[in-house]
Amino acid sequence: MENVLGFVALAAGLIIGLGAIGACIGIGIMGSKYLEASARQPELMNALQTKMFLLAGLIDAAFLIGVGIAMMFAFANPFQL
């Protein structure tokens, strides 16, 4: 029983940690490409900014769904015997 709880805690930590790393890298790459595109074509800055913020929200939402799943594993453990 203790092994299962330990593995669940490890899995929850990995879900949150790796999800955060992936979201941060994704938003960072997207932000750099937005700045690059805005420097090349300044007249498209407003349209690109809207799309960038929409995609940043979707990336962040995927991370928060992972946090919710990890919290479900941690507090409402479906693997109890």
Curated annotation (Swiss-Prot):
Keywords: ATP synthesis, Cell inner membrane, Cell membrane, CF(0), Hydrogen ion transport, Ion transport, Lipid-binding, Membrane, Transmembrane, Transmembrane helix, Transport
Gene Ontology molecular function: lipid binding; proton-transporting ATP synthase activity, rotational mechanism
Feature type site, description Reversibly protonated during proton transport: 60
Localisation: Cell inner membrane
Gene3D superfamilies per the UniProt record, alphabetical: F1F0 ATP synthase subunit C
Any Gene Ontology CC annotation: proton-transporting two-sector ATPase complex, proton-transporting domain
Subunit structure of this chain's protein: F-type ATPases have 2 components, F(1) - the catalytic core - and F(0) - the membrane proton channel. F(1) has five subunits: alpha(3), beta(3), gamma(1), delta(1), epsilon(1). F(0) has three main subunits: a(1), b(2) and c(10-14). The alpha and beta chains form an alternating ring which encloses part of the gamma chain. F(1) is attached to F(0) by a central stalk formed by the gamma and epsilon chains, while a peripheral stalk is formed by the delta and b chains.
HAMAP family linked to this entry: ATP_synth_c_bact (MF_01396)
Family: Belongs to the ATPase C chain family.
Stated name of the protein: ATP synthase subunit c
Source organism of this protein record: Azoarcus sp. (strain BH72)
Gene name linked to the record: atpE
